[in-house]
Amino acid sequence: MSQRKARLSGAILIAFCLALLPCGCEGGGKSRPMGQRIEKKAESKSRLIVLPLQPQGGQAYNGIGLGVHFLLGNVVALHTVFKEFWFGWRVKKIFPQKKKLIAHCRGKDPRLDIAKLGKEQDIRYWLWGSVQKQENRTKIVLVLTDTKGESEERTTELILDPADQLIGFRKGFLTWLDACGFTFPDAQVAKALWPEKTTLKSLDLLGRDLEKYYLHASWGDKSPFDPELFDSAVSEAPFSYLAHDLKGWVRYRNKDYQSAEKSFQSAVKINPAGLGAISGLMWCAVYTHDVEKAYKWAMAKADIRGESREAARVSVDRRIKKAFQ
């Protein structure tokens, strides 16, 4: 009997102590703004994908929507609350046929079933929207969808002005992300605001070139690109990080690794935290079997995202082994 009393007293004491602890339930009665959540391990970070922006209903197609998509993809890649993730990795999964991607970029497709795609592709957050020309200015409408349905879609309207190197547009985007619950880490803000010296014409050319790249790369076209077709955006905006970065990937796709490296180096001089170009430099080093250079760029990328240098080195070893099997 005394043993039973002792056990009962112990259970009561434990229950009393637990009652004093602060409640940690994630599903409490209060709703949380999009993005606000209990801290999770790095491996459980969610993905955010940036879709090509579409022309506002009734407006003619140009490449600006794809150009802004490329800009935002490079910004979001710096946000360490998300896994690094690029639209180019899933083009064919989202648009199974070339004509579907082409129609989407022109605003002539049915709206994507983002909830279904999110579940299929394990992509929780989707950023999409439209471009609207208004006399002498360009309005960008952005929508952020949480496919787990824990909050409503969030929408914002921003003005795109190349005169300030697209910094005002990006500051507005970061402010909106903060309102959605995805505050950009202080250490990453300056990296997201590199001077993108471009023009609307260059963004148009860049977007048209990017569409060609996606179509060629995603559907296994074996013929090489004509790199001269991708010179126009760089010629129009010679100090544009985005233009040099895309040209690097075109040359990389052609397996012209030396020329690709030059383009990526030009991009990194403009934007030292450009993850796309730094990834390109790493891959050029992998395929030229320059192990030390591959380590250098992989670790630079890890530093920018606050990730493990050792894991970056291990990843390079694995990639080199796979590339030369």
How would you name each of these model-derived features?
Residues K40-I114, W126-E135, E153, W194:
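Short beta-strand->alpha-helix linker/helix-N-cap micro-motif
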Residues G35, K92, P96-G207:
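Catalytic-center loop of serine/cysteine hydrolases
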Residues C25-V81, T198-L215, P238, W249, ...:
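A structural "domain/chain start" motif
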